[in-house]
Amino acid sequence: ADVITHYIQHTLNWAPERIFSTSTTLDSARLRRAIAQETGIDQKSITAYALGEHGESQMVAWSAVTIAGKPLSQWRDEYPDTFGKLDLDALADAGREGGWTILRGKGCTEFGIGASAAEVVRAIFYNENRVLSVSVLLNGQYGQHDVYASVPAIVGRDGIAHIIELHLTPEEQEKFDASCRTMSDNYQLSLTL
């Protein structure tokens, strides 16, 4: 989705804030659901984002995950016997691999992406200025240039109103950079087709 979005923006030469994709909107929702299932806390009280590619190289900004406004790291410190035992890799996999699990089970995944697309359309139509993890053109944000990647952004009537830069840990930034390199390489390849 990210590379195709970049290719469309390049081909049409439209304003980048008008060309974006759902990318990890659904993956982020699946991640929040997985965290909710493991913690017993309603997913509406959880903020968590899958960043980068909608695919294998996506990563989770664990340092930005909050539950009821409190950082996940604080929950883990305060409740080591419960939150401290959360398997972050398994939770990230649940967000990334959720679609494959559904596909293997029923042969299609139209409802999840349909719901995510409806979320984006609703944010635009009703000018909600809602924060969603969508693929946007980065030009300086997160240290990236001329690459579409999924990050939190405010979505409203005019498309992308603002790209939100999370403060990533050095390890998270490395993973995000690697994901962006993957997409940039694939985008450059698409230009040769």
Feature locations, PLM:
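Gly/Ser/Thr-rich loops at beta-strand to alpha-helix junctions
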Residues: 1-5, 23-28
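C-terminal substrate-binding/catalytic lobe of Rossmann-fold NAD(P)-dependent dehydrogenases
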Residues: 12-18, 27-193
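Short Gly/Thr/Asp-enriched flexible loops that form oxyanion-binding sites at enzyme active sites
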Residues: 4-12
